[in-house]
Amino acid sequence: MTRIALITGAADGIGWAMAQRFAAAGCRVALADLDGDRAAARAVELGAPHLALRADVADEASVVAMIDETVARMAGLDILVNNAGIGDSHKPTLEQDLATFDRILRVHLDGTFVASREAARAMATRGGAILNVSSIAGLTGLPRRNAYGAAKAGIAAMTKSMACEWAGVGIRVNAIAPGYVGTALVAKLVETGRIDQARLERRIPLGRFADPAEIAEAAWFLCSPAASYVTGAVLSVDGGWSAFGDAGDASG
């Protein structure tokens, strides 16, 4: 059976890696992104029968329309991946403002909630899989990452809550919690000195950042039939970051 998968934030980075992996597994993929033109170009790269959508996950009406259009144009929905997100300011807490804090929560937490709610309506009679993207920032403490960490912790909790509620209608809900991933966005943070890659890699037991394809592989597993008895899980995909509890460097 050909599965229909909707992935938010699919135009670049982890989302694009997911779109490629899910398409390779035989899914028909709807690539949703705030940058609709970029999503359209990516859909062309994948080829038929994939679909591009412009969607703003911070806007409830836009999210509802995204789900409705996917269902209408692709005749259903089997998989939702809530991947869209924005970065934190990295400012000291005393310099952080409430507007930015609220914006980060709205994109990550509210967006995941609304998309999951609407996807569950579409999946109620057929079952399906929802995958949320949490983070090590939601499982451990990262200085200055207040809004981002709170949003990602909320996503982990909401994953478990929804998994318990919707299991009876055959909807599995899981999350992944990536660590540092070698995306273009992270590369910019390294280039501008906002993060120290060498220092961070010493803190990771596996000694390196993840490749986006490695995160996509974990995402596909949780959405695939291979994970048919897995729901309510938050899978760390962080090279051992959250497991390490010793002093000093973990590798190198």
Language-model regions: role of each:
Residues 116, 151, 159:
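Active-site helix of classical SDR
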Residues 90, 231-252:
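Short C-terminal tail/terminal secondary-structure segment
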Residues 91-93, 97-105, 200:
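Substrate-binding pocket helix/loop in short-chain dehydrogenase/reductase
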